[in-house]
């Protein structure tokens, strides 16, 4: 039986990983072992932060809605309660976008929410 030498496959695997580590500083982009650790850590951070991004944006939208609602004399929780009672179905992303880009439309929505609360 012929002896199997895996030098070519190892070189390919190492090269692939070092390409993933492009842009990393120092030996983290040149040395296979440290590059491997850096890439694995980067992938773990990326996985974690893809989930955190959803939370972060929701928090940002809520902060923006709350700020705009308070300018119209209503707190965030009262606004959401009023929207539910008025039967207005609009997600926080769209509501925050309205608050930033179209203050008149946001004020009209807040007025309907206030009416439903009264």
From Swiss-Prot:
GO terms for molecular function: rRNA binding; structural constituent of ribosome. This is Large ribosomal subunit protein bL20. Belongs to the bacterial ribosomal protein bL20 family. Binds directly to 23S ribosomal RNA and is necessary for the in vitro assembly process of the 50S ribosomal subunit. It is not involved in the protein synthesizing functions of that subunit. One of its GO terms (biological process) is translation. Pfam families: Ribosomal_L20. CDD domains: Ribosomal_L20 (cd07026). The keyword Chloroplast does not apply. GO terms for cellular component: ribonucleoprotein complex; ribosome. It comes from Herpetosiphon aurantiacus (strain ATCC 23779 / DSM 785 / 114-95). Keywords: Ribonucleoprotein, Ribosomal protein, RNA-binding, rRNA-binding.
């Amino acid at each position: 039986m012929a002896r199997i030498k895996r030098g070519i496959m190892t070189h390919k695997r190492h090269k692939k990983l070092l390409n993933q580590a492009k842009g990393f500083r120092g030996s983290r982009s040149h040395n296979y072992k440290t590059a491997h650790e850096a890439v694995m850590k980067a992938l773990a951070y990326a996985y974690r932060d893809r989930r955190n991004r959803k939370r972060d944006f929701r928090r940002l939208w809520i902060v923006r809605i709350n700020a705009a609602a308070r300018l119209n004399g209503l707190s965030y929780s009262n606004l959401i309660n009023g929207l539910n009672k008025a039967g207005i179905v609009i997600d926080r992303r769209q509501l925050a976008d309205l608050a930033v880009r179209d203050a008149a439309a946001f004020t009209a929505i807040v007025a309907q929410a206030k009416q439903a609360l009264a």
